């Protein structure tokens, strides 16, 4: 990843309006793990340390609709050593479809006291 001003979908980066806060999270997922459908209000740089991260995006569902079924309309796969800008404000489900543990890290560029994730109900 180099100097970027748009996310992987071409949406311009937007910085939080409140008090800035950077939260770094390291995840370790066993093979077969799958997150629930969710979205992040913020973006941030991410890196896959080992394994493979598969992300299915629903680019058509409204963020306001937290109860309806979601459908994958786009997929991205990131392998060990890949870095990318995590997508904000787009429903997605993330999984480890590989045969080894997935380890990845994300540094969320958010707002102090605000949630980093909204989960489908």
What are these regions (language model features)?
Residues 45-48, 55-56, 83-86, 103-108:
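Structural recognition of the beta-strand scaffold that forms the well-ordered cores
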Residues 28-29, 41-61:
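Short, conserved beta-strand element in jelly-roll/cupin
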Residues 5-8, 13-14, 20, 66-67, ...:
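Double-stranded beta-helix
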Residues 19, 28-31, 57-89:
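Short acidic-glycine-tyrosine-enriched beta hairpin
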Residues 35-44, 91:
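Histidine-centered catalytic micro-motifs
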Residues 37, 55-56, 86, 92-98:
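Short beta-strand His + acidic residue motifs that chelate non-heme Fe in jelly-roll/DSBH
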Residues 17-20, 39, 47, 70, ...:
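Extracellular/periplasmic catalytic domains that process cell-envelope and extracellular macromolecules
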């Amino acid at each position: 990843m180099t100097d970027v001003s748009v996310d992987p979908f071409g949406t311009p980066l937007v910085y939080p309006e409140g008090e800035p806060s950077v939260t770094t999270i390291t995840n370790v997922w066993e093979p077969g793990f799958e997150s629930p459908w969710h979205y992040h209000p913020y973006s941030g740089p991410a890196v896959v340390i080992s394994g493979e991260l598969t992300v299915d995006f629903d680019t058509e569902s409204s963020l306001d609709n937290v109860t309806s079924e979601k459908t994958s309309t786009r997929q991205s796969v990131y392998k060990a050593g890949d870095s990318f800008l995590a997508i904000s404000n787009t429903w997605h489900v993330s999984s480890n479809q590989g045969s080894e543990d997935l380890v990845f890290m994300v540094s969320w560029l958010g707002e102090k006291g605000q949630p980093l994730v909204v989960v489908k109900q």
